[in-house]
Design a protein with these regions (language model features):
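A glycine- and Lys/Arg-enriched "phosphate-lid" helix/loop adjacent to the NTP-binding pocket
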Residues: 73-121
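Short, flexible loop segments at the rims of nucleotide/cofactor-binding pockets, characterized by
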Residues: 26-30, 53-54, 107-110
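Glycine-rich phosphate-binding loop used to anchor ATP phosphates in small-molecule kinases
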Residues: 31-82, 115
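Conserved beta-strand scaffold positions in the cores of enzyme catalytic domains, especially
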Residues: 15-17, 75-77, 129-131
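NTP-dependent small-molecule kinase module
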Residues: 121-168
Length: 168
């Protein structure tokens, strides 16, 4: 999932993750989400670098990125997805079987489609954007560096599906 992949990327500035806050403090998910969002806006106000991990299924997270962009930030994003939300449902079930936290199936599916729907906005906001499919093993399907966009079709993601995904 996100946290597994996140460990392989450099974190610039302050790193915030609501799940980590819940685990460390016992805050509710909502309290932790509000806490980390406050930290992100605080970083923007202070011109500090920051990194965060999110499902990106809410417009509110896009608003954070918009605020950062308006404030002159260079935005680099790594977006992980799967070809189908049922893959995510199965992964959460595996996590629960190993003692991890559960998420309702309907919520997983809803978040999947909301997050995917945010990709065209990411294409606009991000200076650098890498989109990886993690259905089997992580495989890059989109690379955006400034105005240069490359797509990498494969068996799960044909060219037309990638073009639809990024809103081109």
């Amino acid at each position: 999932g996100k946290s597994t992949i996140t460990q392989y990327f450099d974190k610039i500035g302050t790193y915030t993750n609501a799940d980590d806050i819940v685990a460390a403090t016992g805050m509710s998910n909502q309290e932790a989400a509000e806490f980390v969002d406050h930290k992100r806006y605080e970083a923007i106000e202070n011109g500090e670098d920051f990194t965060f991990e999110t499902v990106l299924s809410s417009q509110y997270k896009i608003e954070i990125l918009k605020k950062a962009k308006e404030s002159g930030y260079f935005i680099k994003c790594v977006f992980m997805l799967t070809v189908d939300p049922e893959v995510n449902v199965a992964r959460v079930a595996t996590r629960v079987a190993s003692g991890g936290h559960d998420v309702e199936k309907s919520k997983i599916i809803e978040r999947y489609y909301k997050a995917v729907a945010n990709i065209p906005q990411l294409m606009e906001l991000c200076d650098i954007l890498h989109i990886y499919d993690n259905t089997i093993t992580p495989v890059r399907i989109v690379r955006k560096h400034k105005d240069d966009i490359s797509i990498f079709p494969n068996d799960l993601w044909p060219e037309a599906k990638i073009i639809e995904l990024i809103g081109e």
